[in-house]
Amino acid sequence: MDILKDKIRSEGIVLSEHVLKVDAFLNHQIDPQLMQQVGHAFATRFRDQGITKIVTIEASGIAPAVMAGLELGVPVIFARKYQSLTLKDNLYISKVFSFTKQTESTIAISAKHLNAHDHVLVIDDFLANGHAAKALIDLIGQAGASIAGLGIVIEKSFQDGRALLESEGYRVESLARVKSLAGGQVEFLD
């Protein structure tokens, strides 16, 4: 997706050979027009898959997931990273390790929103080692729902997330595939 790659080149900041900061348009400040195009791109790739729900993780996956949900006409569920007073009973629960934050979190989805009749599209802002995706897949599996695939805004192709997910039979569609962040420069795979 050329417009996304252009945005990454112009506003992304390479913090290290493994960390790309995109808080100017994706995971702190959000560019609504870009997210609308991101949602359209995911909808185009998965429109014929019979999607009934989109699942993401709070917080940075919410904007692209909502835009895809709008395009596909389906609800969006975001896994919460903590339990609150309003989210405490009948939950699907998993653990996720954040590469960027170097912490483990508990995530949860209410069982009343996801069930075995659902066919799910997973959407997230980044794919690196696949930990967040695997945690979401675990939650979806607990519900007995099926997975159409994963839509990733930015994939760090130099890490093993895609290989892990594809080896387990999951379809992965990434809108921007980063080959390298070496030398403070973003190099795309395609």
From Swiss-Prot:
The biological processes this protein is annotated with in GO are:
purine ribonucleoside salvage; xanthine metabolic process; XMP salvage
Q: Which positions bind xanthine? A: 20, 27, 156
Keywords for this protein: Cytoplasm, Glycosyltransferase, Purine salvage, Transferase
Report the leader peptide range. none
Which compartments does it reside in? Answer: Cytoplasm
* Pathway the protein contributes to: Purine metabolism; XMP biosynthesis via salvage pathway; XMP from xanthine: step 1/1
The entry lists its GO molecular-function terms as: xanthine phosphoribosyltransferase activity
In this chain, 5-phospho-alpha-D-ribose 1-diphosphate is annotated as bound at 128-132
Q: What is its EC number?
A: 2.4.2.22
Pfam families reported for this sequence: Pribosyltran (PF00156)
Q: Which reaction does it catalyse?
A: XMP + diphosphate = xanthine + 5-phospho-alpha-D-ribose 1-diphosphate
- Per its UniProt record, what CDD domains does this chain match? PRTases_typeI
Q: Which InterPro entries does UniProt cross-reference here? A: PRibTrfase_dom, PRTase-like, Pur/Pyrimidine_PRTase, Xanthine_PRibTrfase
The record's listing under NCBIfam families reads: PRK09219.1, XPRTase
Q: How does it assemble?
A: Homodimer.
**Biological function:** Converts the preformed base xanthine, a product of nucleic acid breakdown, to xanthosine 5'-monophosphate (XMP), so it can be reused for RNA or DNA synthesis.
* Homology family: Belongs to the purine/pyrimidine phosphoribosyltransferase family. Xpt subfamily.
In terms of PANTHER family, this protein maps to:
HYPOXANTHINE/GUANINE PHOSPHORIBOSYLTRANSFERASE (PTHR43864), XANTHINE PHOSPHORIBOSYLTRANSFERASE (PTHR43864:SF1)
Q: Which HAMAP family match?
A: XPRTase (MF_01184)
Name of the protein described by the UniProt record: Xanthine phosphoribosyltransferase
Q: Which organism is it from?
A: Pseudomonas aeruginosa (strain ATCC 15692 / DSM 22644 / CIP 104116 / JCM 14847 / LMG 12228 / 1C / PRS 101 / PAO1)
